[in-house]
């Protein structure tokens, strides 16, 4: 699917959300993930909307999402988001449940602390080891 495409496959509505880097770059200012080829997806299952972000940062397209029940956001430096970027994205589109993933050595409790006042966002941490 191309950035922005929407398809229905076997009863599931799938929306392609551009996934790319804005801040984190390779040497020479080349993004780890340039805009264009990569997507995250919003998948609608009956009345539930799930966002799986892919390898991305807190892009304007992500921050404009609406009515997300569950979000999976990457938190892996230098390729994706810092805990602060994940918190910024979550505060913008307000998923009911947030699972950080891909976080490797980043302490997920940093994200929990950043969102502790966001009472309508439940952060769920799973052991990645």
Where are these regions (language model features)?
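Proline-rich intrinsically disordered, low-complexity coils
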Residues: 31-37, 78, 83, 95, ...
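Proline-aspartate-enriched helix->loop->beta-strand connector
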Residues: 68-73, 77-100
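Short glycine/proline-enriched coil/turn segments at helix->beta-strand junctions
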Residues: 46-48, 66-69, 94, 119-120
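Core dinuclear metal-dependent hydrolase active-site scaffold
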Residues: 1-66, 126-129
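Short, glycine/charged-enriched secondary-structure capping and boundary segments
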Residues: 29-30, 57, 65-68, 85-89, ...
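Active-site environment of divalent metal-dependent phosphoester hydrolases
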Residues: 5-8, 22, 57-61, 78-83, ...
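Broad hydrophobic/π-residue packing in well-ordered secondary structure
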Residues: 41-43, 51-52, 79, 103-106, ...
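Binuclear metal-ion centers of metallo-dependent hydrolases, dominated by the metallo-beta-lactamase
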Residues: 1-6, 87, 91-129
